[in-house]
């Protein structure tokens, strides 16, 4: 019976149009003048020295392409202090709302994490123990 109730609640939430923001547990991890960065702490995966985590950027103003928010998978190499983004979906509205502006499925190139950027905050959260 409990399984049926849980399944019903799950489906009711999906049918009710839960946005990606409410469907996932986003935690604010940092902010600059341009962007607020959120992570889904429940999504962290560990594979040796690699950490994978879903992140969301909420821009204060739309960028040149009209993007106001984006969600993506960020992989962190804890040994070499590098990261790469992929599976990115960008939206015209704040917090993953509005029209879908762009979508990229592939993972990007590995890049060094800038010491004063927002990605260093997630690196510390997922790699430093």
Per-range role (PLM):
Residues 19-129:
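N-terminal secretory-pathway/extracellular module detecting exported/lumenal segments
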Residues 8-17:
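Bacterial N-terminal signal peptides
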Residues 1-9:
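Bacterial N-terminal signal peptides that target proteins for export
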């Amino acid at each position: 019976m409990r399984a049926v109730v849980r399944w019903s609640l799950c489906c009711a939430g999906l049918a009710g149009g839960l946005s990606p923001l409410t469907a996932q547990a986003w935690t604010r991890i940092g902010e600059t003048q341009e962007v607020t960065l959120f992570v889904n702490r429940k999504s962290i995966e560990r594979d040796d020295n690699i950490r994978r985590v879903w992140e969301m950027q909420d821009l204060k103003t739309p960028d040149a392409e009209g993007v106001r928010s984006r969600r993506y998978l960020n992989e962190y190499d804890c040994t070499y202090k590098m990261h790469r983004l992929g599976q990115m979906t960008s939206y015209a509205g704040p917090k993953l709302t509005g029209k879908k502006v762009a979508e990229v499925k592939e993972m990007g190139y590995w890049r060094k994490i800038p010491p004063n950027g927002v990605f260093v905050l997630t690196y510390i959260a997922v790699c430093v123990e």
